[in-house]
Curated annotation (Swiss-Prot):
Top-level taxon in the UniProt lineage: Bacteria
Top EC category: isomerase
Localization annotation: Cytoplasm
GO MF annotation terms: ATP binding; ATP-dependent protein folding chaperone; isomerase activity; unfolded protein binding
Protein name: Chaperonin GroEL
Gene: groEL
Binding positions for ATP per the UniProt entry: 30-33, 51, 87-91, 415, 481-483, 497
Family as reported in the entry's similarity comment: Belongs to the chaperonin (HSP60) family.
Length: 544
């Protein structure tokens, strides 16, 4: 077993403090509209330029193992906030440092760390309740655009794109961010259900220019096994041909005689048909086929359910107003499924998302929900250079998550103003705490609430304490607009923060800072001293 180095009490706390401070200093310079960039060296490719707190935090790794523990704990604050709300990572880091630094001063002066932590937790609950009270639901397209603009570092183009995407795909829709090939940042919206499986033969294409197969008022056959022989397949094909409607076939695979028959039918000008492979793999494939069946009002023909392809009839087929199949993907527009069945399916998927502990499963379930309920929007981020593109993509990601958070829990006056407005409520709560150290813990949170505003002001080249006093003396929604160096009504000016982001930042910061304050010992491996390299071999005495 490797020997360990143990630090106790004061020495341990100093090491943690140094680690916390080192990480926080690197992260907090990015806060606010006048926050600076951080350049991160990469082992391959160009350096990364970013203003995203969690990206900076993830790159910090300190040489001293004990200091690194403090840094890693604060890194956890940023990561947890990003996981919960998708934004607010820098605010969370600033709050964590403020709570820990002030708490450490009191622990050193003799306060009981456990009572301090209890006081911190009680104060955070009071502030979170107040945040929920003062938050305002998002009602307009304009407010969504404002939230996204602020989170994208005051980039109105990004803000408007995200608001447009949200409007088109709805609350449950999926917005994905990709890198574009050109300079322009554009929005593509895929309405209806889309999955990445294209036609099995180019002969199915109905438009030679776009190489797409477009089927209007189509029937949809959904089968969970391979189709290779024509014998079992022929009865349903004859029924469809008699109906005069085009047919989309979705199956695990279509090959051999079955595929050849369909292709020959198309070449000879028979009824319009297109065959695609089923999306997904394993159990996920089955679930997606069931989704398509519910969306189109058809049935999944499955031998597990006692159904056979040879017994299939028109009543089992789904229906869609339009189907567009390209070489790479398939889109089903306006499936004719029952609205109640579709809503029940969406609720079932939402429940699975809540119950799932795997991030990957949650992401895949969210994709299914989006495809069923709203559609998919893709924001393609373009820029002149790769470095600029990556920096811009970070901002688009932040803005997207902030917007989703705003729709979920409402909005607050931004720029750190909302936390300042919670100070009077917390001051009124203090006398209710009878334990002196708990009261000190609550006062630590009280003082920390002004830290984000002071940091935004400092990054704008102003004195944070003076700005704080000015904001405290003003009315509810008035705050400091660092971009214009003016005091204004933050809601009217469109300087907004999602309530979920502010709440998550405070909760994560207080949780980790409280744990650090109650830490009395640090255990780390003693780094092994590597032996000096062997001296170079002397020359063999031969001249060339």
């Amino acid at each position: 077993m490797v020997a360990k180095n143990i630090k106790y009490n004061e020495e341990a706390r100093k090491k943690i403090q140094k680690g916390v401070k080192t990480l926080a200093e690197a992260v907090k310079v990015t806060l606010g509209p006048k926050g600076r960039h951080v350049v991160i060296d990469k082992s391959f490719g160009s350096p990364q330029v970013t203003k995203d707190g969690v990206t900076v935090a993830k790159e910090v790794e300190l040489a001293d193992k004990h200091e690194n523990m403090g840094a890693q704990m604060v890194k956890e604050v940023a990561s947890k906030t990003a996981d919960k709300a998708g934004d607010g990572t820098t605010t969370a880091t600033v709050l964590a440092e403020a709570i820990y630094t002030e708490g450490l001063r009191n622990v050193t002066a003799g306060a009981n760390p456990m009572d301090l932590k209890r006081g911190i937790d009680k104060a955070v609950k009071v502030v979170v309740d107040q945040i929920k009270k003062i938050s305002k639901p998002v009602q307009h397209h304009k407010e969504i655009a404002q939230v996204a603009t602020i989170s994208a570092n005051n980039d109105a183009e990004i803000g408007n794109l995200i608001a447009e995407a949200m409007e088109k795909v709805g609350k449950n829709g999926s917005i994905t961010v990709e890198e574009a090939k050109g300079f322009e940042t554009v929005l593509d919206v895929v309405e209806g259900m889309n999955f990445n499986r294209g036609y099995l033969s180019s002969y199915f294409a109905t438009n030679p220019e776009t190489q797409e197969c477009v089927l209007e008022d189509a029937l949809v056959l959904i089968y969970d096994k391979k189709i290779s022989g024509i014998k079992d397949f022929l009865p349903i094909l004859q029924q469809v041909a008699e109906s005069g409607r085009p047919l989309l076939i979705i199956a695990e695979d279509i090959e051999g005689e079955a595929l050849a028959t369909l292709v020959v039918n198309r070449i000879r000008g028979g009824f319009r048909v297109c065959a695609v492979k089923a999306p997904g793999f394993g159990d996920r494939r089955k679930a997606m086929l069931e989704d398509i069946a519910i969306l189109t009002g058809g049935q999944l023909i499955s031998e597990e359910l006692g159904m056979k392809l040879e017994n299939a009839n028109l009543a089992m087929l789904g229906k869609a107003k339009k189907v567009i199949v390209s070489k790479e993907d398939t889109t089903i527009v306006e499936g004719m499924g029952e609205k109640e069945a579709l809503e029940a399916r969406c609720e079932s998927i939402k429940k699975q998302i809540e119950d799932s502990s795997s991030d990957y499963d949650k992401e895949k379930l969210q994709e299914r929900l989006a495809k069923l309920s709203g559609g998919v929007a893709v924001i393609r981020v373009g820029a002149a250079t790769e470095i600029e593109m990556k920096e811009k993509k970070d901002r688009v990601d932040d803005a997207q998550h902030a917007t989703i958070a705003a729709v979920e829990e409402g909005i607050l006056p931004g720029g750190g103003t909302a936390l300042i407005r919670c100070i009077p409520t917390l001051e009124a709560f203090l006398p209710m705490l009878t334990n002196e150290d708990e009261q000190i813990g609550a006062r630590i949170v009280l003082k920390a609430l002004s830290a984000p505003l002071k940091q935004i002001a400092a990054n704008a080249g102003k004195e944070g304490a003076i700005i704080f006093q000015q904001v405290m003396s003003r009315s509810a929604n008035e705050g400091y607009d660092a971009l214009r160096d003016a005091y204004t009504d933050m809601l009217e000016a469109g300087i907004l923060d999602p309530a979920k982001v502010t709440r998550s930042a405070l909760e994560s910061a207080a949780s980790v800072a409280g744990l650090l304050l109650t830490t009395e010992a640090l255990i780390a491996e003693i780094p092994e001293e590597k032996p000096a390299a062997a001296p170079a071999m002397p020359g063999a005495g031969m001249d060339y």
